[in-house]
Amino acid sequence: MKCAVAILLVCLTLQQAAYGFLYNEEVKTEFQRRKQSLEEAGESLKQMGQNLQDNMQRSLAEGQEALQKHIKNLQQSMLSQKEALRNRGEALRETVGERLESMQNQGKDWMKKMQEGRETLQKKLGEQVETFNQTFQAGRLAIAKKVLEGSETMRKTIQNTTQSLQDKAEKVQETAGKNVEALKLIARKNALSLKESLDTLRENSVEENMQALRNFLPSQSEAMDLPKEKLQELMASIQNNTGLFQESWGQEKEKMKEMLRGLKRKVGERTEDMKRKMKARKEELEAEFQSRGDEAVQTVMEIRNVTIKHLREAGKKIKEIEEKIASLLPNSCLDFLRSKALKMGVKIVVQDLKSVFRMGWLRVPETFEKEEEIAPSTEEDGSEELEADSYDSKVGGESPISQRTEERQGAEERSRLRRRRAAVLRRMFGQWSRKS
Protein backbone atom coordinates (compact mmCIF):
# COMPACT_ATOMS: atom_id res chain seq x y z
CA MET A 1 0.00 0.00 0.00
CA LYS A 2 2.74 2.37 0.95
CA CYS A 3 4.63 1.52 -2.19
CA ALA A 4 1.57 2.27 -4.29
CA VAL A 5 1.19 5.58 -2.60
CA ALA A 6 4.84 6.42 -3.10
CA ILE A 7 4.63 5.44 -6.73
CA LEU A 8 1.55 7.55 -7.14
CA LEU A 9 3.32 10.52 -5.55
CA VAL A 10 6.34 10.05 -7.81
CA CYS A 11 4.07 9.93 -10.84
CA LEU A 12 2.30 13.08 -9.80
CA THR A 13 5.62 14.85 -9.24
CA LEU A 14 6.89 13.80 -12.63
CA GLN A 15 3.65 14.95 -14.22
CA GLN A 16 3.90 18.38 -12.57
CA ALA A 17 7.53 18.70 -13.62
CA ALA A 18 6.60 17.86 -17.20
CA TYR A 19 3.76 20.42 -17.13
CA GLY A 20 6.10 23.11 -15.68
CA PHE A 21 8.70 22.53 -18.38
CA LEU A 22 6.11 22.74 -21.11
CA TYR A 23 4.65 25.96 -19.57
CA ASN A 24 8.07 27.62 -19.35
CA GLU A 25 8.70 26.88 -23.00
CA GLU A 26 5.38 28.43 -24.00
CA VAL A 27 6.08 31.49 -21.84
CA LYS A 28 9.47 32.00 -23.41
CA THR A 29 7.98 31.65 -26.86
CA GLU A 30 5.20 34.16 -26.05
CA PHE A 31 7.75 36.56 -24.53
CA GLN A 32 9.91 36.41 -27.62
CA ARG A 33 6.93 36.94 -29.86
CA ARG A 34 5.68 39.91 -27.79
CA LYS A 35 9.16 41.42 -27.60
CA GLN A 36 9.42 41.25 -31.35
CA SER A 37 6.01 42.84 -31.77
CA LEU A 38 6.96 45.59 -29.30
CA GLU A 39 10.14 46.31 -31.20
CA GLU A 40 8.16 46.51 -34.42
CA ALA A 41 5.65 48.82 -32.72
CA GLY A 42 8.50 51.02 -31.38
CA GLU A 43 9.96 51.32 -34.84
CA SER A 44 6.59 52.25 -36.26
CA LEU A 45 6.01 54.74 -33.40
CA LYS A 46 9.43 56.28 -33.97
CA GLN A 47 8.59 56.66 -37.63
CA MET A 48 5.21 58.14 -36.78
CA GLY A 49 6.85 60.59 -34.29
CA GLN A 50 9.30 61.69 -36.92
CA ASN A 51 6.47 62.20 -39.39
CA LEU A 52 4.43 64.04 -36.75
CA GLN A 53 7.37 66.30 -35.89
CA ASP A 54 7.87 67.11 -39.55
CA ASN A 55 4.17 67.82 -39.96
CA MET A 56 4.15 70.02 -36.82
CA GLN A 57 7.16 72.03 -37.99
CA ARG A 58 5.60 72.50 -41.40
CA SER A 59 2.21 73.50 -39.88
CA LEU A 60 3.93 75.84 -37.39
CA ALA A 61 5.81 77.56 -40.20
CA GLU A 62 2.58 77.88 -42.16
CA GLY A 63 0.79 79.20 -39.03
CA GLN A 64 3.50 81.78 -38.36
CA GLU A 65 3.35 82.92 -41.97
CA ALA A 66 -0.46 83.14 -41.78
CA LEU A 67 -0.19 84.95 -38.45
CA GLN A 68 2.22 87.49 -39.89
CA LYS A 69 -0.11 88.04 -42.83
CA HIS A 70 -3.04 88.38 -40.43
CA ILE A 71 -1.11 90.84 -38.24
CA LYS A 72 -0.18 92.88 -41.31
CA ASN A 73 -3.82 92.92 -42.39
CA LEU A 74 -4.84 93.98 -38.88
CA GLN A 75 -2.24 96.72 -38.83
CA GLN A 76 -3.41 97.96 -42.20
CA SER A 77 -7.05 97.88 -41.06
CA MET A 78 -6.08 99.66 -37.82
CA LEU A 79 -4.18 102.28 -39.80
CA SER A 80 -7.12 102.77 -42.15
CA GLN A 81 -9.56 102.99 -39.22
CA LYS A 82 -7.14 105.33 -37.44
CA GLU A 83 -6.99 107.52 -40.54
CA ALA A 84 -10.78 107.47 -40.82
CA LEU A 85 -11.15 108.34 -37.16
CA ARG A 86 -8.53 111.04 -37.50
CA ASN A 87 -10.35 112.51 -40.49
CA ARG A 88 -13.63 112.36 -38.63
CA GLY A 89 -12.00 113.91 -35.58
CA GLU A 90 -10.50 116.67 -37.72
CA ALA A 91 -13.91 117.31 -39.30
CA LEU A 92 -15.53 117.28 -35.88
CA ARG A 93 -12.83 119.59 -34.53
CA GLU A 94 -13.31 121.97 -37.46
CA THR A 95 -17.09 121.90 -36.97
CA VAL A 96 -16.79 122.43 -33.24
CA GLY A 97 -14.14 125.12 -33.82
CA GLU A 98 -16.43 126.92 -36.24
CA ARG A 99 -19.34 126.65 -33.81
CA LEU A 100 -17.09 127.79 -30.98
CA GLU A 101 -15.78 130.69 -33.05
CA SER A 102 -19.33 131.69 -34.01
CA MET A 103 -20.36 131.42 -30.37
CA GLN A 104 -17.36 133.48 -29.32
CA ASN A 105 -18.21 136.10 -31.94
CA GLN A 106 -21.82 136.06 -30.81
CA GLY A 107 -20.69 136.32 -27.20
CA LYS A 108 -18.42 139.24 -28.13
CA ASP A 109 -21.35 140.91 -29.91
CA TRP A 110 -23.54 140.35 -26.86
CA MET A 111 -20.82 141.65 -24.58
CA LYS A 112 -20.42 144.68 -26.84
CA LYS A 113 -24.18 145.27 -26.81
CA MET A 114 -24.27 144.81 -23.05
CA GLN A 115 -21.36 147.24 -22.68
CA GLU A 116 -23.11 149.74 -24.96
CA GLY A 117 -26.35 149.30 -23.00
CA ARG A 118 -24.46 149.71 -19.74
CA GLU A 119 -22.73 152.83 -21.06
CA THR A 120 -26.05 154.19 -22.36
CA LEU A 121 -27.68 153.47 -19.01
CA GLN A 122 -24.79 155.10 -17.16
CA LYS A 123 -24.98 158.07 -19.52
CA LYS A 124 -28.75 158.39 -19.00
CA LEU A 125 -28.33 158.00 -15.28
CA GLY A 126 -25.58 160.62 -15.34
CA GLU A 127 -27.80 162.97 -17.33
CA GLN A 128 -30.71 162.39 -14.95
CA VAL A 129 -28.44 162.88 -11.94
CA GLU A 130 -27.03 166.03 -13.55
CA THR A 131 -30.57 167.28 -14.25
CA PHE A 132 -31.56 166.43 -10.71
CA ASN A 133 -28.48 168.23 -9.38
CA GLN A 134 -29.21 171.24 -11.56
CA THR A 135 -32.85 171.25 -10.42
CA PHE A 136 -31.75 170.88 -6.83
CA GLN A 137 -29.18 173.65 -7.23
CA ALA A 138 -31.78 175.87 -8.92
CA GLY A 139 -34.25 175.15 -6.12
CA ARG A 140 -31.61 175.79 -3.51
CA LEU A 141 -30.63 179.04 -5.24
CA ALA A 142 -34.31 180.03 -5.44
CA ILE A 143 -34.75 179.21 -1.76
CA ALA A 144 -31.59 181.14 -0.91
CA LYS A 145 -32.80 184.04 -3.07
CA LYS A 146 -36.19 183.98 -1.39
CA VAL A 147 -34.54 183.78 2.02
CA LEU A 148 -32.21 186.66 1.11
CA GLU A 149 -35.13 188.69 -0.21
CA GLY A 150 -37.13 187.91 2.93
CA SER A 151 -34.18 188.71 5.16
CA GLU A 152 -33.55 191.93 3.20
CA THR A 153 -37.21 192.87 3.47
CA MET A 154 -37.17 191.97 7.13
CA ARG A 155 -33.98 193.98 7.65
CA LYS A 156 -35.49 196.97 5.91
CA THR A 157 -38.69 196.57 7.94
CA ILE A 158 -36.70 196.25 11.15
CA GLN A 159 -34.55 199.22 10.13
CA ASN A 160 -37.61 201.32 9.28
CA THR A 161 -39.32 200.27 12.48
CA THR A 162 -36.17 200.99 14.47
CA GLN A 163 -35.82 204.36 12.75
CA SER A 164 -39.45 205.17 13.41
CA LEU A 165 -39.07 204.05 17.01
CA GLN A 166 -35.92 206.17 17.32
CA ASP A 167 -37.76 209.12 15.81
CA LYS A 168 -40.65 208.55 18.14
CA ALA A 169 -38.25 208.16 21.07
CA GLU A 170 -36.52 211.38 20.08
CA LYS A 171 -39.90 213.06 19.79
CA VAL A 172 -40.87 211.60 23.15
CA GLN A 173 -37.54 212.74 24.59
CA GLU A 174 -38.00 216.17 23.06
CA THR A 175 -41.56 216.29 24.30
CA ALA A 176 -40.39 215.08 27.69
CA GLY A 177 -37.72 217.81 27.71
CA LYS A 178 -40.32 220.38 26.77
CA ASN A 179 -42.61 218.97 29.41
CA VAL A 180 -39.79 219.16 31.97
CA GLU A 181 -39.12 222.76 30.99
CA ALA A 182 -42.82 223.48 31.15
CA LEU A 183 -42.99 221.72 34.50
CA LYS A 184 -40.03 223.76 35.69
CA LEU A 185 -41.73 226.93 34.54
CA ILE A 186 -44.92 225.78 36.12
CA ALA A 187 -43.01 224.92 39.28
CA ARG A 188 -41.40 228.39 39.27
CA LYS A 189 -44.74 229.94 38.61
CA ASN A 190 -46.22 227.80 41.31
CA ALA A 191 -43.41 228.73 43.66
CA LEU A 192 -43.91 232.42 42.88
CA SER A 193 -47.62 232.04 43.13
CA LEU A 194 -47.12 230.03 46.31
CA LYS A 195 -44.90 232.76 47.70
CA GLU A 196 -47.43 235.33 46.68
CA SER A 197 -50.09 233.10 48.15
CA LEU A 198 -48.13 232.78 51.37
CA ASP A 199 -47.70 236.51 51.46
CA THR A 200 -51.35 236.86 50.68
CA LEU A 201 -52.14 234.27 53.32
CA ARG A 202 -50.13 236.17 55.81
CA GLU A 203 -52.01 239.27 54.88
CA ASN A 204 -55.48 237.76 54.51
CA SER A 205 -57.60 236.09 57.04
CA VAL A 206 -58.17 232.41 57.50
CA GLU A 207 -61.49 232.31 55.68
CA GLU A 208 -60.09 234.11 52.66
CA ASN A 209 -57.15 231.70 52.51
CA MET A 210 -59.40 228.64 52.60
CA GLN A 211 -61.51 230.00 49.78
CA ALA A 212 -58.44 230.71 47.64
CA LEU A 213 -57.09 227.19 48.30
CA ARG A 214 -60.37 225.65 47.19
CA ASN A 215 -60.17 227.57 43.91
CA PHE A 216 -56.50 226.71 43.24
CA LEU A 217 -56.50 222.88 43.68
CA PRO A 218 -58.70 221.83 40.65
CA SER A 219 -56.76 223.97 38.17
CA GLN A 220 -53.44 222.60 39.46
CA SER A 221 -54.55 218.96 39.20
CA GLU A 222 -55.66 219.55 35.60
CA ALA A 223 -52.28 221.06 34.76
CA MET A 224 -50.48 217.99 36.25
CA ASP A 225 -52.69 215.40 34.46
CA LEU A 226 -52.05 216.80 30.96
CA PRO A 227 -48.39 215.49 30.53
CA LYS A 228 -49.37 212.08 31.97
CA GLU A 229 -52.06 211.61 29.31
CA LYS A 230 -49.64 212.52 26.50
CA LEU A 231 -47.04 210.07 27.84
CA GLN A 232 -49.61 207.27 28.07
CA GLU A 233 -50.73 207.93 24.47
CA LEU A 234 -47.11 207.76 23.29
CA MET A 235 -46.48 204.43 25.09
CA ALA A 236 -49.71 203.00 23.68
CA SER A 237 -48.69 203.98 20.11
CA ILE A 238 -45.25 202.38 20.64
CA GLN A 239 -46.86 199.15 21.88
CA ASN A 240 -49.26 199.12 18.93
CA ASN A 241 -46.42 199.55 16.42
CA THR A 242 -44.38 196.80 18.13
CA GLY A 243 -47.36 194.40 18.02
CA LEU A 244 -47.92 195.10 14.31
CA PHE A 245 -44.22 194.53 13.61
CA GLN A 246 -44.21 191.23 15.53
CA GLU A 247 -47.40 190.10 13.78
CA SER A 248 -46.05 190.93 10.30
CA TRP A 249 -42.72 189.25 11.12
CA GLY A 250 -44.55 186.09 12.29
CA GLN A 251 -46.60 186.05 9.08
CA GLU A 252 -43.45 186.42 6.96
CA LYS A 253 -41.76 183.60 8.89
CA GLU A 254 -44.79 181.33 8.38
CA LYS A 255 -44.83 182.14 4.66
CA MET A 256 -41.13 181.32 4.32
CA LYS A 257 -41.54 178.05 6.27
CA GLU A 258 -44.51 177.07 4.11
CA MET A 259 -42.53 177.85 0.97
CA LEU A 260 -39.57 175.76 2.22
CA ARG A 261 -41.90 172.85 3.07
CA GLY A 262 -43.50 173.01 -0.37
CA LEU A 263 -40.12 173.11 -2.10
CA LYS A 264 -38.83 170.16 -0.03
CA ARG A 265 -42.01 168.22 -0.82
CA LYS A 266 -41.61 168.88 -4.56
CA VAL A 267 -37.93 167.91 -4.46
CA GLY A 268 -38.79 164.69 -2.55
CA GLU A 269 -41.56 163.79 -5.01
CA ARG A 270 -39.22 164.44 -7.95
CA THR A 271 -36.48 162.35 -6.32
CA GLU A 272 -38.87 159.43 -5.61
CA ASP A 273 -40.21 159.58 -9.15
CA MET A 274 -36.67 159.56 -10.54
CA LYS A 275 -35.71 156.62 -8.28
CA ARG A 276 -38.77 154.65 -9.43
CA LYS A 277 -37.96 155.32 -13.08
CA MET A 278 -34.31 154.34 -12.59
CA LYS A 279 -35.31 151.15 -10.74
CA ALA A 280 -37.82 150.19 -13.46
CA ARG A 281 -35.23 150.80 -16.19
CA LYS A 282 -32.63 148.81 -14.27
CA GLU A 283 -35.07 145.88 -13.89
CA GLU A 284 -35.86 146.00 -17.62
CA LEU A 285 -32.16 145.95 -18.52
CA GLU A 286 -31.46 143.12 -16.05
CA ALA A 287 -34.37 141.09 -17.48
CA GLU A 288 -33.08 141.68 -21.02
CA PHE A 289 -29.50 140.73 -20.05
CA GLN A 290 -30.82 137.63 -18.22
CA SER A 291 -32.87 136.50 -21.23
CA ARG A 292 -29.91 136.97 -23.57
CA GLY A 293 -27.63 135.16 -21.12
CA ASP A 294 -30.10 132.24 -20.88
CA GLU A 295 -30.22 132.00 -24.69
CA ALA A 296 -26.41 131.96 -24.85
CA VAL A 297 -26.19 129.29 -22.15
CA GLN A 298 -28.83 127.18 -23.94
CA THR A 299 -26.89 127.42 -27.22
CA VAL A 300 -23.62 126.48 -25.49
CA MET A 301 -25.35 123.53 -23.80
CA GLU A 302 -26.77 122.27 -27.10
CA ILE A 303 -23.36 122.47 -28.80
CA ARG A 304 -21.63 120.76 -25.89
CA ASN A 305 -24.25 117.99 -25.73
CA VAL A 306 -23.92 117.34 -29.49
CA THR A 307 -20.12 117.30 -29.19
CA ILE A 308 -20.21 114.95 -26.21
CA LYS A 309 -22.60 112.68 -28.13
CA HIS A 310 -20.17 112.49 -31.08
CA LEU A 311 -17.25 111.88 -28.74
CA ARG A 312 -19.10 109.06 -26.98
CA GLU A 313 -19.93 107.46 -30.32
CA ALA A 314 -16.24 107.70 -31.28
CA GLY A 315 -15.29 106.13 -27.92
CA LYS A 316 -17.74 103.28 -28.51
CA LYS A 317 -16.29 102.69 -31.97
CA ILE A 318 -12.78 102.62 -30.51
CA LYS A 319 -13.99 100.00 -28.00
CA GLU A 320 -15.56 97.97 -30.80
CA ILE A 321 -12.29 98.09 -32.75
CA GLU A 322 -10.35 96.95 -29.67
CA GLU A 323 -12.79 94.08 -29.04
CA LYS A 324 -12.67 93.09 -32.71
CA ILE A 325 -8.88 93.04 -32.67
CA ALA A 326 -8.91 90.97 -29.47
CA SER A 327 -11.41 88.49 -30.94
CA LEU A 328 -9.53 88.07 -34.24
CA LEU A 329 -6.16 87.32 -32.68
CA PRO A 330 -5.53 83.56 -32.02
CA ASN A 331 -4.61 82.21 -28.61
CA SER A 332 -1.14 81.11 -29.72
CA CYS A 333 -0.18 84.76 -30.35
CA LEU A 334 -0.67 85.83 -26.73
CA ASP A 335 3.05 85.85 -25.96
CA PHE A 336 3.77 87.87 -29.04
CA LEU A 337 0.99 90.36 -28.20
CA ARG A 338 2.39 90.82 -24.73
CA SER A 339 5.79 91.73 -26.08
CA LYS A 340 7.13 95.21 -25.48
CA ALA A 341 7.17 96.27 -29.12
CA LEU A 342 3.47 95.52 -29.66
CA LYS A 343 2.60 97.19 -26.35
CA MET A 344 4.36 100.33 -27.49
CA GLY A 345 2.58 100.17 -30.85
CA VAL A 346 -0.83 99.75 -29.22
CA LYS A 347 -0.01 102.54 -26.77
CA ILE A 348 0.94 104.89 -29.62
CA VAL A 349 -2.23 103.98 -31.55
CA VAL A 350 -4.45 104.56 -28.50
CA GLN A 351 -2.68 107.83 -27.76
CA ASP A 352 -3.18 109.01 -31.35
CA LEU A 353 -6.83 107.98 -31.33
CA LYS A 354 -7.52 109.81 -28.10
CA SER A 355 -5.45 112.86 -28.99
CA VAL A 356 -7.82 113.39 -31.92
CA PHE A 357 -10.72 113.99 -29.56
CA ARG A 358 -8.88 116.08 -26.97
CA MET A 359 -10.57 119.46 -26.54
CA GLY A 360 -9.86 121.35 -23.37
CA TRP A 361 -12.91 123.66 -23.43
CA LEU A 362 -15.28 120.64 -23.51
CA ARG A 363 -13.59 118.75 -20.65
CA VAL A 364 -13.12 115.64 -22.85
CA PRO A 365 -10.77 113.82 -20.39
CA GLU A 366 -13.61 113.62 -17.87
CA THR A 367 -15.86 112.26 -20.62
CA PHE A 368 -13.35 109.51 -21.54
CA GLU A 369 -12.95 108.60 -17.89
CA LYS A 370 -16.71 108.26 -17.61
CA GLU A 371 -16.77 106.10 -20.78
CA GLU A 372 -14.09 103.81 -19.35
CA GLU A 373 -16.17 103.12 -16.24
CA ILE A 374 -18.82 100.64 -17.47
CA ALA A 375 -21.68 101.57 -15.14
CA PRO A 376 -25.39 102.43 -15.62
CA SER A 377 -25.17 105.86 -14.02
CA THR A 378 -22.22 107.07 -16.14
CA GLU A 379 -24.12 109.14 -18.67
CA GLU A 380 -26.38 110.73 -16.05
CA ASP A 381 -23.39 111.79 -13.91
CA GLY A 382 -21.62 113.20 -16.99
CA SER A 383 -24.68 115.19 -18.06
CA GLU A 384 -25.13 116.55 -14.54
CA GLU A 385 -21.47 117.60 -14.43
CA LEU A 386 -21.76 119.25 -17.83
CA GLU A 387 -24.89 121.11 -16.76
CA ALA A 388 -23.19 122.25 -13.56
CA ASP A 389 -20.14 123.41 -15.55
CA SER A 390 -22.38 125.23 -18.03
CA TYR A 391 -24.32 127.06 -15.31
CA ASP A 392 -21.07 127.95 -13.53
CA SER A 393 -19.89 129.86 -16.62
CA LYS A 394 -22.98 131.90 -17.50
CA VAL A 395 -23.30 135.23 -19.36
CA GLY A 396 -20.16 137.12 -20.26
CA GLY A 397 -17.77 134.32 -21.20
CA GLU A 398 -15.04 132.72 -19.11
CA SER A 399 -13.16 134.84 -16.62
CA PRO A 400 -9.31 134.99 -17.00
CA ILE A 401 -7.32 132.78 -14.61
CA SER A 402 -3.81 133.13 -13.33
CA GLN A 403 -0.73 131.45 -14.79
CA ARG A 404 -0.31 129.26 -11.73
CA THR A 405 -3.86 127.92 -12.05
CA GLU A 406 -3.30 127.16 -15.75
CA GLU A 407 -0.08 125.27 -14.98
CA ARG A 408 -1.82 123.25 -12.27
CA GLN A 409 -4.69 122.40 -14.61
CA GLY A 410 -2.20 121.35 -17.32
CA ALA A 411 -0.39 119.05 -14.87
CA GLU A 412 -3.69 117.52 -13.73
CA GLU A 413 -4.76 116.96 -17.33
CA ARG A 414 -1.45 115.25 -18.17
CA SER A 415 -1.76 112.97 -15.13
CA ARG A 416 -5.34 112.11 -16.12
CA LEU A 417 -4.16 111.24 -19.65
CA ARG A 418 -1.44 108.96 -18.27
CA ARG A 419 -3.91 107.18 -15.97
CA ARG A 420 -6.41 106.80 -18.81
CA ARG A 421 -3.84 105.32 -21.19
CA ALA A 422 -2.71 102.84 -18.54
CA ALA A 423 -6.33 101.84 -17.87
CA VAL A 424 -7.01 101.33 -21.60
CA LEU A 425 -3.92 99.14 -22.01
CA ARG A 426 -4.76 97.12 -18.90
CA ARG A 427 -8.29 96.57 -20.15
CA MET A 428 -7.13 95.54 -23.64
CA PHE A 429 -4.54 93.01 -22.42
CA GLY A 430 -6.95 91.77 -19.75
CA GLN A 431 -9.55 91.00 -22.45
CA TRP A 432 -6.97 89.22 -24.62
CA SER A 433 -5.71 87.17 -21.67
CA ARG A 434 -9.26 86.13 -20.72
CA LYS A 435 -10.05 85.13 -24.31
CA SER A 436 -6.81 83.11 -24.50
Curated annotation (Swiss-Prot):
Tissue: Component of the acid-insoluble organic matrix of the aragonitic skeleton (at protein level).
Protein name, UniProt field: Uncharacterized skeletal organic matrix protein 6
Signal peptide limits: 1-20
Organism the protein comes from: Acropora millepora
Renumbered residue ranges of the record's region Disordered: 371-419
Skewed-composition ranges (Basic and acidic residues): 404-415
One annotated Gene Ontology cellular component of this protein: extracellular region
Keyword Phosphoprotein: no
Chain intervals with Acidic residues compositional bias: 371-390
Cysteine disulfide partners in this protein: none
Keywords, in A-Z order: Coiled coil, Secreted, Signal
Coiled-coil segments: 25-87, 154-207, 247-329
Compartments where found: Secreted
Principal subcellular localisation of the protein: secreted
